[in-house]
Swiss-Prot record:
Pfam family, one: UPF0102
Higher taxonomy: Bacteria, Thermotogati, Thermotogota, Thermotogae, Thermotogales
SUPFAM superfamilies referenced in this protein's UniProt entry, alphabetically: Restriction endonuclease-like
GO molecular function term, any single one: nucleic acid binding
Protein name: UPF0102 protein TM_0253
Organism: Thermotoga maritima (strain ATCC 43589 / DSM 3109 / JCM 10099 / NBRC 100826 / MSB8)
InterPro entries (UniProt xref): Restrct_endonuc-II-like, tRNA_endonuc-like_dom_sf, UPF0102_YraN-like
Stated family: Belongs to the UPF0102 family.
């Protein structure tokens, strides 16, 4: 079974291959943590990485509270770094079968 560090490393490599620029990893605030902050063209992308194997889909561990915390942390990052313009939250699922990228997940 892969640990979270391995999963994040694989996710970073995957995103770089897609042309993303990794800006920061494991960004923390009082609101929560964002695994990867990246740039996709003009857009800032906040990426939550989930890994796992077995019968439970890693994405099932993401609930509304987690999404709200991601949104707050993303907004804080934008303000703290004086960034304007488009931004989004993505999820990357890393399993032994491969990597799936879900773009533009905003639930609020």
């Amino acid at each position: 079974m892969m640990d979270w560090k391995e999963a994040e490393e694989l996710a970073c490599k995957f995103l770089k291959k897609k042309g993303y620029k990794i800006l920061e990893r494991n960004y923390r605030t009082k609101y929560g943590e964002i695994d990867i902050v990246a740039r996709d063209g003009r857009e800032i992308v906040f990426v939550e990485v989930k890994s796992g194997s077995g019968k439970v889909d890693p994405l099932e561990r993401i609930d509304l509270k987690k999404v709200r915390n991601l949104e707050q942390t993303a907004r804080f990052y934008m303000i703290q770094n004086k960034l304007k313009g488009p931004a989004r939250v993505d999820f990357v699922r890393v399993t032994p079968e491969g990597i799936d990228h879900f773009e533009g997940i905003w639930l609020g």
